[in-house]
């Protein structure tokens, strides 16, 4: 009896993880609107950025920030190209370390079947949770210990 219960729990847990992975992969295949809120608790200052997220058929990603400034990010397996639309400048950053860009890899290539809601990259922890079927939230502290929350919304 105890073994059967344990087996059922393991099957349920595996299904939950694969369902979460599949749901996240389906969610991030949509054109999304996002709001990123950064909260500096030391200074009690809050900043907000707004923009769009698009994953292309070739698995490249385009992120456009519309507020408070205008930037466009083109992300592929080799580089991140940043267009500062206000100053008409372009900066290219090569992607050398795939561990550094694990979150980008998941967004581009898909979340693994055994994914839970946490990613650890160089001691930074990212929590990814569904708020509801149309909203996903990513929470993390950046390298300056500022709390960041990015909420992605499906465009309906």
Enumerate the language-model features and the residues they cover:
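Sec-dependent N-terminal signal peptides
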Residues: 4-14
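Flexible, surface-exposed loop/linker segments and immediately adjacent secondary-structure boundaries
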Residues: 86-125
């Amino acid at each position: 009896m105890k073994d059967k219960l344990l087996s059922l729990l393991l099957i349920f847990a595996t299904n939950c993880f694969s369902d979460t992975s599949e749901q996240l992969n389906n969610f991030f295949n949509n054109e999304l609107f996002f709001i990123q809120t950064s909260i500096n608790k030391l200074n009690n200052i809050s900043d907000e950025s707004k923009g769009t997220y698009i994953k292309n058929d070739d698995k490249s990603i385009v992120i456009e920030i519309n507020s408070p400034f205008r930037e466009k990010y083109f992300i592929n397996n080799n580089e991140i190209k940043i267009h500062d639309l206000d100053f008409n400048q372009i900066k290219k950053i090569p992607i050398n370390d795939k561990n550094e860009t694990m979150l980008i890899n998941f967004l581009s290539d898909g979340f693994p079947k055994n994914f839970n809601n946490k990613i650890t990259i160089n001691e930074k922890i990212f929590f990814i949770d569904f708020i509801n079927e149309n909203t996903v939230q990513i929470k993390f502290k950046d390298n300056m210990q500022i709390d960041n929350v990015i909420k992605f919304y499906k465009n309906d």
